[in-house]
Swiss-Prot record:
Source organism per UniProt: Bacillus subtilis (strain 168)
Protein name: Uncharacterized protein YyaD
Domain of life from the UniProt record: Bacteria
GN (gene name): yyaD
Amino acid sequence: MLWRAGMKWMLLILGSLIGAGYASGQEIWQFFGAESGLAIVLFTIMFIFSSYIVMKISFKVQSTHFLPVLEHLMGPWLAKIYDVLIIFYLFSTTMVMIAGGGVTLQMYKLPFWWGITLICIVTVCLFLWDVKGILSINSILIPVLVAGLLYALISFQSTHHHTWTIDLSQQYNWPASITFTSLNILSVVAILSSVGKEMKGLGEAKIASVASGLIFGVISFVYNETLVELAGSLSQFEIPLFAVLEGAPYFLFLCMTAVLCLAIYTTTVAGLLGLSSRLMAFIHMPRWMIVLILLVLMVPFTSFGFSDLIAFLYPIYGMLNLYLLVCLLLYPILSKWK
């Protein structure tokens, strides 16, 4: 029972992290690249620790949205600032996911706006079943998503025979681990704060944080090493994953496009879960109706380029969230002084 609960939260974490930006390779290439092996190892350690602290606080305050967790972590005044920041973050990153969905479904000869409409309809339908529906769909989609990504990356490596090495004297990009962790930890705060009341104990928090961190770290390392090999040709592709798939059988290309759609869908759902949970504190409407209104507001902004949105928004959020990451890392020490 403990392991099942831990795996349930692990899948929720991975669903919020592995989105269009990550699965497409844009996010990894934006932050890492050459000389980043140590950065990814450091990121994995910080992510595991930070995720556990978020779940610990969420369970302690029995939260249903992220404001109580922020208030416990950094005090009421700063919490209000980060409350607004997270709302904007969830809105804009979910908007990026939807734009990525439109781009990806074009691979199936579906017009951009038709693809976006399809994603919005399927998303609203899922929210008719609320949180239970999301957890159920995650238990099916996330294993398929992780397996698909690893299969594509390992298939590429098996045909190119590249040797992975971490030369500690050539790891100048290690600071990227800090900004990448701070970017991703905001998603974790937003999503896991919504389910603090549903947790039964801290054992499941330990399982979820360690398992999700290790899986995310391994995929990030393999993906980054693959993109480093392809560095010379990446500028020709809107989506780096398609550079990895170049020359692969057409069936694999179609399967990975489907995996990319799954990544977009799960992250869109996770972002809207966090956003709707916060808005339900002062908007008394069914969750699915709030989600529908949010999607209607987001769609006009998707006309901006997918890669342009990621290149502009993600580094800014990574820098803004450094203080939040510091609060999480120092929480065990500072909480003893209170």
